[in-house]
Amino acid sequence: ASGVKAQDKVEASVGADLVSGYIWRGQDLGGVSIQPGAGLSYKGFSLSAWGSVGFEGTDTKELDLTLGYEYGGFSVGVTDYWFTSADSPARYSDYKDAHTFEVALGYDFGPVAVNWFTNFAGSVGVNEDGKDAYASYFSVSAPFSLGGIDWTAEIGATPWANDFYNGYSNGFKVSAISLQASKEIKITDSFSLPLWA
């Protein structure tokens, strides 16, 4: 959630999700997975770590580190994604092939949020000529409430040819259409169980 007034103290968060499948920007990255995360935020700035580890040996393992800033509806961030899988094992120290560095820009208009992401270093994706494609992805999402449940409809696409998303895209391609439902179930005054699908 974004607000015009930034908080005056450091806030910390920690959590983990257990998911039945991991699909990211239209790509199937694994089955049942545990996805822990932690973050710090202060006056609009944030630093977070997030990961995903699947229960199957063939599932993608991932660690993301993100530095971001939000003001009003505007957001900007830089993320270091590290991916490895049984098909393409990679060492964490392999910054050229195992890491993808991405810049993100977004604006939340209230009823609709628009985000743009571009890979700028590491594994940036290549085009049909084998040249760096600086693979990009953009999404438009719209949150709404219905029947006591919070919903988010989202559509995402890659704007030009690259092999980073969905194996290969030879141009503009819609790669994700989703409808997410979420609800928090209050267990105690200080603990809630978030459910989403």
Task: Identify the role of each PLM range.
Residues 1-11:
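Cleavable N-terminal export/targeting peptides
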Residues 10, 30-34, 41, 59-63, ...:
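Residues that define the transmembrane beta-barrel architecture of outer-membrane proteins
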Residues 14-22, 44-55, 74-88, 111-122, ...:
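Transmembrane beta-strand segments that form the barrel wall of outer-membrane beta-barrel proteins
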Residues 16-18, 36-42, 65-69, 78, ...:
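Residues on the lipid-exposed face of transmembrane beta-strands in outer-membrane beta-barrel proteins
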Residues 23-34, 53:
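Surface-exposed strand-loop-strand hairpins of Gram-negative outer-membrane beta-barrel proteins
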Residues 26-29, 57-58, 90-93, 126-130, ...:
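Short, solvent-exposed loop/turn segments at secondary-structure boundaries
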Residues 44, 109-193:
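Outer-membrane beta-barrel transmembrane domain signature
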Residues 61-69, 74-99:
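Glycine/small-residue-rich loop that forms an oxyanion/phosphate-binding "nest" at active or ligand-binding sites
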